Amino acid sequence: MTTVLPGAGLPKSFSARAELRARVLSAEEERRLRGHGALVSDFRQQKLEREARRNWDLFYKRNRTRFFKDRHWTAREFGELRACRQFEDQKLTILEAGCGVGNCLFPLLEEDPNIFAYACDFSPRAVEYVKQNPLYDPGRCRVFQCDLTCDDLLDHVPPESVDVVLLIFVLSAIHPEKMPLVLQNICKVLKPGKRVLFRDYGLYDHAMLRFKAGSKLGENFYVRQDGTRSYFFTDGFLARLFTEAGCEEVLSTYVFRETVNEKEGLRAPRVFLQSTFQKPLRSAASGPRGRVPHPGPS
């Protein structure tokens, strides 16, 4: 099965872009997908949007720091964290947008002493959990609360000062209509020629197929029982978002995994989309614009 997005209104080079092949559904999975039914009412959708921050804050209140496992795979999966250096011990400045309670942040800081990190999250409670972590060192990490769809990152991060932006399982939690605002925001702090590393839920992931009727908000967009939302990406949709934000696609691939529960005899096919995008270089004559820079990391 190949997912194809219409190319109307897109640059010619993008319209000709070959789509990746999505996971092929079984007959039972297709039946389950058809059972998702009608969309959630506009009234409830607007309420979910208004209460998005509250719902994520309640999520972290319930689960504290226990829900997600530490992501020790980030440096292994994204070779760009090594490749973007000109020499081995070069210091890197990264931004983790949507850091949660630090499951990706702290393993990276532990593994690489030459990283300084900015990190932000929608949830004030998640930010406090990061600051309370024994591994939190203000000399190596600056964490702050931020709604990436409306709060200006330049209030916290100097313009064009970041070598790598991590977008790991965060964009899916944002309404698709507001995703372009997030990308415009992060591009302001990313250096020209540097990259965004993305990983998130892919089309037909097991989590998507598990939703029941009354959960569908839009195409590939769903709400969980706790009010948090999740979008399931195609590579074409993601490439269009970044292209329209002025970035160039470097690499995109679907990552297919299987979660096995031997005790229950269950096998769950997982689908993630992993991609890299680059902010184009610009002429040396045009300097960065923005706020007065903060003191840089030492």
Regions found by a protein language model. Name each.
Residues M1-R54, L58:
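N-terminal auxiliary segments of SAM/dcSAM-dependent transferases
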Residues G202-E264:
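C-terminal alpha-helical "lid/dimerization" subdomain adjacent to the S-adenosyl-L-methionine
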